[in-house]
Amino acid sequence: MRKETGLKLTAGQLLARGVCRHLLSYDYVSLLEFIPKTGRRVDVIGLGPKGEIWIVECKSSVVDFQSDHKWQDYLEWCDRYFWAVDKNFPIELLPSESGLIIADPYDAEIIHMPQEERLNSSRRK
């Protein structure tokens, strides 16, 4: 019998894992639980091959989404902002101007690509 080892991942962490795997297909490098200068922690930040910065917030439930009051603070720290949710999440609750990623623990798919809002160059340093 094989003994289970390691940490149990939360539902949000499993979504983040699928998102990171998908971003790799775009040649993006991902960091989990990154803290920009604001001091607030983002779930996933993706760094693209041309210097693009994407932030992805992973929401595992409606309650998780509704209790997130910090997400708008992230908009000025990225070129594109996304929500990542599972296939059962009621996507009509999400702001339409944000990007949408449907994810699972193994992969993800970008459903809606948000308009690019180029990050101020002084913030890229």
Segments from the language model and where they lie:
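Surface-exposed, flexible loop/turn segments at secondary-structure boundaries
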Residues: 38, 52, 89-90, 106-108
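Short, flexible loop segments at the rims of nucleotide/cofactor-binding pockets, characterized by
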Residues: 33-35, 57-64
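Non-catalytic C-terminal interaction segments of nucleic acid-processing enzymes
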Residues: 1-35, 93-125
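Active-site beta-strand-loop-beta-strand hairpin of nuclease catalytic cores
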Residues: 38, 42-55
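N-terminal short leaders/motifs
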Residues: 1-4, 51-59
